[in-house]
Amino acid sequence: MKQSLPDVSVCLIYLAGMAVWGFVAGRILPYSWQDETKYPFRSLPFEKNGRIYEKIGIRKWQNKLPDMSKVFKGLMPAKKLEGDLAQKLPVMIKETCVAEVTHIFLGLAGVICPFLWKGLGVWCLTFAYVLGNLPFILVQRYNRPRQMQLLKSITQKRKTCVRKSYKREGKEREDTDFEL
């Protein structure tokens, strides 16, 4: 008699495989495919540039979530913003898009399980898997508008400083000549 794994075990193996696949796909997705100013990454009106998530206490719990940049230090940019923020923020903003796409994919991959395998355990595992990816999506939706605003502020301050510097030196310069 042939013995097979219980459906919940097969589902668990499938979900682990999808997590690995999602991680690898997230690392190879080109940043150019992800425009933080357009749908689906642009902050929606009801999100109020991420402030809506403060109602669920996101500031208190977001740093308690596992951080893959600490696990795979060479593969992912660190989340700490040190040094030249104007240079690092665009990368961080793109990384929020990558993370959001990855966790949405993982959530959708989890929804498929009950259609492939049967049992209450499969439903429980699916529910936990989908629900477990939701906080990561919310953190990206919360942080991205804040990072974009910070980058805009830094860029504006640098432009102002350069303009003032050139005015003191008695030089005129076109806005298009500014290097940030």
Locations of regions flagged by a protein language model:
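Alpha-helical membrane-inserting segments
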Residues: 17, 21-25, 29, 109, ...
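Hydrophobic alpha-helical transmembrane segments of multi-pass integral membrane proteins
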Residues: 13, 17, 67, 73, ...
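Membrane-interfacial segments
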Residues: 28-33, 37, 118-122, 143, ...
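Hydrophobic core segments of alpha-helical transmembrane domains in multi-pass membrane proteins
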Residues: 14-15, 113, 122-133
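Cytosolic-side membrane-entry/anchor segment at the start of a transmembrane helix
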Residues: 1-24, 85-91, 138, 142-151, ...
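Membrane-proximal soluble regions of multi-pass membrane proteins
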Residues: 31-92, 153-179
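Transmembrane alpha-helical segments and their cytosolic interface motifs
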Residues: 89-121
